């Protein structure tokens, strides 16, 4: 009983330790504390076995020991004391207990109580001096913060004396001394030209890390001046990156912090040459990060930092390759990051002196030539990236032959003239984990990957077991077959990208042996045939599978498929046939992207698809699917895009759709019938219903806040345009063309935004999923080969613009695609009548307006001159009258202008864009004159038949149609009244008229039977 009780107490004490403290113990002294603890427990158990004659009872000693265990656990958890620090003495006490002698125990008990209180005394919160200093810092920070953000300034920092400042946000303390050792201040909305008074930091004498990414403009200290940071003698890390607007004026302050080992000035908009001389006193500096600025050479003074091990100059504008001569003198460098600069020319030979270098990133520059032969001296090199440079000609890997530690190699060229030397004499000593060779006109896989094989096109020997984990040879010219034994040769492969090449033939069945592979992209090749059974059953670790744009055939994923972990599946643009079977996808809750578009699938849309609860993108467009749309399919909660267009679907539209964050719904080119539900626009961002057989009127839509593209072209919609359309405040593209709408154009359409003020919103559907995978980790390269699964779905929007019905694409990963700038309204080919509302001229962001092929009358509103961004204006095939407003010549963006086949008259305006329009824009308007027509506005009409032989000037003024109609009606009425008056008097004319009438009546009667 007693044994069980004490063991139970021991377990409870162990579980009382906080996970963070346990992790800290493991990091500093892994295994030591626990080994000692287990040893003491074993010692205690041995003493029990040796005392078999002693009857074990639940004595006061055992109870006190248990209480001590609890106290030890609580104090250790609260104060940051390691578990061994208190448990071991107490376990020692229990293991040495003489269960027969209470006095001896009490003596030891008193001793351990004293020691326990001593441990408790060592557990300290923050000291009062630093607590007051933190409150002063907060007060100062509030004084330089914008008033709107004052509530967000260190809300947990308060003046409550019972509050432990070591528990405040942005603070880290030493658990033993209670002194502040880290202060982190993130991005803040500070007032303009805000300076930090460094003297406020002086009370933090043991601070080791300062992170001030807060939008500051500089430092100030009216007492200590530039030497202010020298008072922080323990300061090792100073991070001033991001959101700061520092310039070189802060460098004298920084130079005083001679204890610094790490300095980051990343992303501070610093320009021009960096004065390394001004930080020459930082002789202990090991890491210097100046990335994401606008710095350029020279680099003189860098050699003062002799202990520097990591240098990051990426994302700047360094250009001269000769500037690297200074870097070559930094022989203690471990990591050098020079990517995304403007270095031009060949790599200098002196880089071979950096024999301690582990990481070298030269990507995204303008380097050319080849690798220097001196690279064979970089014996410590593990990571080399030469992506996105301007290499041309033959590129040799021979300088890398002896680099036994090389794990990561990346190469690509912005030029299409680079060719890889795939065969060479030296035998390469490295075993790469990551290979990226893109856009290199590669026709063969390099020999260092294939080793001792026959060097035909991409063949591998059966005996190779390569340690390669990441292989990217996409966007090359490799043709032929994948080797049959690729799965045996690369069994450890985790990710492979062979997209955009010219591979042919079947997919090798040996790929089923790649049981560890998680990402496979073979899209945009010429593969054919069925998917091998071993492949669909063996690669059970696959999460991302892209086989798009090939010629695979057969049934889509048989029932025995083992792709149970799939998150992204793209098999679009192939030749898969048959129905969409049940398979194992029916129970997959991790699948996020499923694209089966552009195949030959038949049958109904299976109802089990609604069980794919994690689905965000579903595209089954351009197949031969029939039946109705399952309502449950559109109710999936996370669905953001569904494309069922280009099928043979029938039935009615669903009344509403799901999607927590807005859905893009493409149902065009089907055979859907019936009315459009008034609730359909709820939570819908894009609705494409073009070319169906929908009928009825435009409904009184409810909840229209989300919709910004509405396309209903080519249906059988009737009735007038609903004024509810005026509530589409966020609309960008509105297409109601090719229907049977009638009535007037609502003047309230000027309420439509056609270009929202919030430019951050975008049309695209981009679901970017990051799958962490540490292929390589260093100071600057952390999870460098994290594969970002760009699960975006390109959206195709067809809209009439510039006399063409074109496709516009969006939904790239970024929000600057073409759809973000497309604002248009198409009401053409309907039966609309009446005047064109002048209020439409208020749609200043509109780029396309098409009102052609209607029955619109009156004149062209002069307010259209306010359409500053208009590119295409089509008013053809109406009954418009009057002249073309001269103000329209101010439309500098106008490319297409069509007013053909109307009743317009007068002089055609000239100037600016109107000088570019040809005669086709004005056909069918006989009363228009001037260029580009052949009708002169100054033509004279002569009369050779006049009696006096004189000439009368022909009036070429435009016909006033209103006056013409009025005079014609007056003449008609006057004639009728005159005839009526004549009939009222007895005169020869009246009698003659009556005789004619009588004769006509008699003639008609004689003709009747």
Curated annotation (Swiss-Prot):
Signal sequence region: 1-22
UniProt xrefs under PROSITE patterns? LRR
In which compartments does the protein localize? Cell membrane
What would be one Pfam family of this protein?
Answer: LRR_1
Q: Which ranges does the record mark as transmembrane?
A: 962-982
Spans within the Cytoplasmic topological domain: 983-1009
Q: How does it sit in the membrane?
A: Single-pass type I membrane protein
Key word Repeat present in the record? Answer: yes
- LRR repeat ranges, renumbered to this chain: 204-231, 232-255, 257-281, 282-305, 306-329, 331-354, 355-377, 379-402, 404-427, 442-465, 466-490, 492-514, 515-538, 540-565, 567-587, 588-612, 613-636, 638-660, 662-681, 682-705, 707-728, 729-752, 819-842, 843-866, 867-891, 893-916
Instruction: Map out region (Disordered) in residue numbers.
Output: 934-955
Extracellular-side segments = 23-961
The UniProt entry's GO CC annotations, sorted and at most eight, read: plasma membrane
Gene3D superfamilies recorded for this chain?
A: Ribonuclease Inhibitor
Residue spans with biased composition (Acidic residues)? Answer: 945-955
Glycosylated at which positions?
A: 159, 197, 267, 390, 402, 497, 516, 526, 551, 588, 611, 716, 751, 850, 890, 903, 934
Write down the superkingdom of origin. Eukaryota
State the UniProt keywords alphabetically.
Cell membrane, Glycoprotein, Leucine-rich repeat, Membrane, Receptor, Repeat, Signal, Transmembrane, Transmembrane helix
**Xref: InterPro entries:** Leu-rich_rpt, Leu-rich_rpt_typical-subtyp, LRR_dom_sf, LRR_N_plant-typ, RLP_Defense_Trigger
The family assignment reads: Belongs to the RLP family.
Descriptive protein name: Putative receptor-like protein 8
Query: What gene makes this protein?
Result: RLP8
